[in-house]
Amino acid sequence: MAFVEHDPQGQANAAAFVEGLGALNWKEGSNLRIDWRWGDSDPTLMEHYAAELVALSPDLLLAGSSSLATDVLRRRTGKIPIVFANVTDPVGQGFVASLGHPGGNVTGFSNYDPVMVSKWLGMLTQLTPPVANVAALYNPATTPYAALLLHAIEEAAPSLSVTVRAATVKDDAEIELVMAGLAREERSGLLVLPDIFTSGHRDSIIALAARYQVPAVYPFRSFVAAGGLMFYGIETSETFRRATGYVDRILKGAMPADLPVQTPVNFKTVVNLRTAKALGFTIPPALLVAADEVIE
């Protein structure tokens, strides 16, 4: 319910979900009906669609790829099972009592592991020239879990000899101010936090990073495919495919309260050599060897 309908990543997630269900013998038009809603990264639209979906009295709700989608659905119903596919801090946001024992009508798949944060910073420090000053870009209105990520970033920074700061934004103009400020600093770089705002403003962020020659690590592979520099994290389409296992179990009688929240299993590194060259940075051989995908 969070993605833009025509976004390639949103379509890949939807396809993986349908394929995963098919492998479990759930076929649309036969024994399954799926009512799709695309929130287009718009909180107001997502509230509207949440009300629509709950009014349909479905057997299950899939909160597709954002904490906000999970929250708006959870506030609408305490009875219909909800499976989330991409939430950063389900305990901190009150979606579940604990990862091991959710205890309510909500469970699903987290997109966060503490190792990710040190990896993000490490990728920036491995560049030539290395980055030493990092801004973490996000919109506080749509990133209620920002404190968790910022705390982890601040804890990882000293061991990498990096200084970090929060860069809060709410529109393209403020994104440009952040980029312009980083361009005036020496050895500066950017972490783009996972957030429906940053996903919705992906093209602007990438274009401004290119204009101001700011190296950045992005939260999803789709950013690097669209011209961003580097990505480390999970493939969201894989998480949607994994989510079908819980959907299958719940439709067969399992209770969300009894299904532990699953954490990431596989991580991928993607680098864009073309973008590195345009920005004036060199990707070290060790990082290229470790990368799962190199865009040339």
Predicted segments, located by residue:
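Short hydrophobic alpha-helices and adjacent helix-cap/hinge residues
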Residues: 1-296
